Amino acid sequence: ACIVVGGGNTFHLVAELHRYGLMEAISKVAKNGTPYIGWSAGSNIACPTLCTTNDMPIVQPASFNTLNLIPFQINPHYLDPQPEIDKMIKHGGETRQDRINEYLAVNQNMKVVGLREASAIWVVGDKYILKGGKKMVVFKYGAEPIELEPNADVTSFVI
């Protein structure tokens, strides 16, 4: 048996999980050894909070706290800054990296993983391994982002 949580709007998912008392139940079962698989919104809720989602806040959840299965935040579907495209669509908006840096400015002890498409973080015991064919980016307050190769043990970078 395992727990599988897919995508959708993270705010809505978190609101419903809190509403039905499932956040605590899922967290407890997963922390007791039941495998957890999450992608998109499902990866966001594995984090301590939903604060690094890309979703619109279409509802107000009871709390931004999520499952806290991992000690860092994930930004799924991470897109690298592309200055030419960003210039064309820049309407006072921000890149993903800008948003992550804003988050880190007020959450200075947290790390954020920019997880690109078709990538996953496989947790085995206390080790975190990047799976898939693309690099991931680790953001930490006051430091340059670090890119890590697929199939690497990324534990020391995210803990």
Kindly give the residue locations of the regions a language model identified.
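C-terminal and late-domain segments of enzyme folds
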Residues: 2, 50-52, 56-159
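Glycine/threonine-rich flexible loop motifs
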Residues: 10-20, 85-86
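Charged helix-capping and loop-helix junction motifs
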Residues: 17-24, 58
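Catalytic nucleophile loop
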Residues: 4-7, 29-49
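Hydrophobic alpha-helical segments and helix pairs
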Residues: 2-8, 12, 25
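Short, active-site-adjacent cap segments at secondary-structure transitions
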Residues: 10-11, 43-46, 120-122
